[in-house]
A protein has these predicted regions:
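Core beta-strand elements of the Rossmann-like FAD/NAD(P) dinucleotide-binding domain
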Residues: 1-5, 9, 123-126
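Conserved FAD-binding catalytic core of PHBH/FMO-like flavoproteins
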Residues: 5-114
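Phosphate-coordinating loops and pocket residues in cytosolic domains that bind phosphorylated ligands
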Residues: 18-21, 124, 177
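C-terminal helical "tail/cap" subdomain of flavin- and related membrane-associated enzymes
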Residues: 78, 158-200
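Basic, amphipathic juxtamembrane/active-site segments
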Residues: 141-154, 158-161
């Protein structure tokens, strides 16, 4: 394949970013998050489509996951606890988070770690980064997804303009610098604050 530019939009473990030698600066949160899918009638109990549960121990986000009664609860726990016994501890979290003892149906659960990181540059020559390849943050508030969509939208305008001669190549430098600045000054701090508030 021969091309003038490459866009790395290949996720938080981006091979493109690594091959360019760009560092991924930031930190990993000490907690483990557990994402769970369940069937339970939250709407009948007055829940909105998205809910933040503020609690020092049982902090969580509860959101509707589809149009057929599937909901997602994502909560945090000590990463030192063994992954093998998550299903046992999950029951305790549900007791604290669900408003009553009516039965629920657990569909799936998955543990994961959360990072707040940003590439040292969103451009390396003819390679540009977008989305999670460029930056990652915790999922609370959907800011990572929104930021990635905005990256794609702006790069989707800038790159064709440069390729077709309607704009100078430095437009791509401006894309890289501005999107990185917005993540470091706005998106990243807002996401970190969302997580901090959950644990109050």
């Amino acid at each position: 394949i021969h091309c003038r530019y490459v866009v790395g939009a290949d996720g938080g473990r981006s091979t493109v970013r690594q091959l360019c030698g760009l560092s991924f600066e930031g930190y990993t949160h000490p907690e483990r998050l557990v994402s769970t899918n369940l069937r339970y009638d939250f709407e009948a109990r007055g829940f909105a489509r998205a809910n933040f549960v503020l609690d020092p121990v049982h902090w969580a986000v509860i959101v509707i996951a589809d149009r057929h009664g599937l909901w997602r609860i994502t909560y945090g726990e000590d990463s030192a606890l063994p992954e093998e016994t998550i299903s046992e501890r999950l029951v305790e979290h549900y007791r604290a988070l669900l408003p009553d003892r009516d039965p629920y149906k657990l569909e799936a659960f998955a543990p994961f770690r959360v990072h707040e990181r940003c590439a040292s540059s969103f451009r390396a020559g003819r390679v540009l980064l977008a989305g999670d390849a460029a930056h990652v943050c915790n999922p609370f508030g959907g800011l990572g997804l929104t930021s990635g969509l905005l990256d794609g939208n702006l790069l989707g305008d800038a790159l064709p303009a440069v390729i077709h001669g309607a704009a100078h190549d430095d437009l791509l430098d401006r894309y890289a610098a501005e999107r990185r600045r917005v993540f470091l000054e706005v998106t990243g701090p807002a996401a970190a604050e969302n997580k901090r508030r959950l644990k109050e």
